[in-house]
Amino acid sequence: MANLKEIRNRITSVSSTMQITSAMKMVSAAKLKKAQDAITAMRPYAEKLTELLQNLSASLDGDVGGEFTTQREVKKVLIVAITSNRGLCGAFNTNVIKEAKNRSEYYAGKQVDIFAIGKKGNDILSKTLTVIDNQSSVFDHLTFDNVAAIAETLTQKFVSGEYDRIELVYNQFKNAATQIVQTEQFLPLAPIQSDKPVSTGDYIFEPAKDEIVLTLIPKALKTQLYKGIRDSFASEHGARMTAMHKATDNATDLRDQLKLTYNKARQAAITNEILEIVGGAEALKG
């Protein structure tokens, strides 16, 4: 059995760790609330924009997506992996990295590159795959304009023919304990499908509907990427809060076990001392 000093040192170490994880849990909980409010407010806008684009497209004949819907033979694929800049968030980053690798294997025999958004994804994926860019600084000041600039870069890579397909891989936020890895086709634009009936009312449009659609598509792409990053950002804080909650609980259990071990060891030491004293006294009597 470890001596009392070693056990006391372990209790002190575990207690210190518990304080750190508890503090990180509270910080993540505060950040989660703000991030959750942002993605909750974002989703209705994204859904309405998609609905508007769908209604306009349904009332037009032929290909109205222009260069954004161009279907080419898939030879070069760009996977946009959205992770975090920091760890200690459970399997949050691992799941995205694993899915990005799975998509790379799916396109075996083709050129597959990675566009990393987040330091953790860049650090791991760059070891086995080609990472052409890392936009980890976007999380320092997460705004629509900053994300829009990234979306424009991705769009240009597709329009110029540098890549034939671009996909997004990220964690979709459900709640603090649940994040679902999503893979979405970014470009070319996939046909918009919906179970809801399409409204094709008789409206007067200015400018023409096809011009409006071509104006809305870049906006929709920027919104799609912004929503994905916002989802990932909220998922990160939810995953970290959950991980730190579990770590705090485990540290508490370990501390309690160590205290029990310490008390047993201390009791055994005291008992041995008493026995030695009694034995010595009996020896003197004899």
Residue map of PLM features:
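C-terminal beta-strand-loop-alpha-helix "lid" module of Rossmann-like NAD(P)-dependent dehydrogenases
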Residues: 1-286
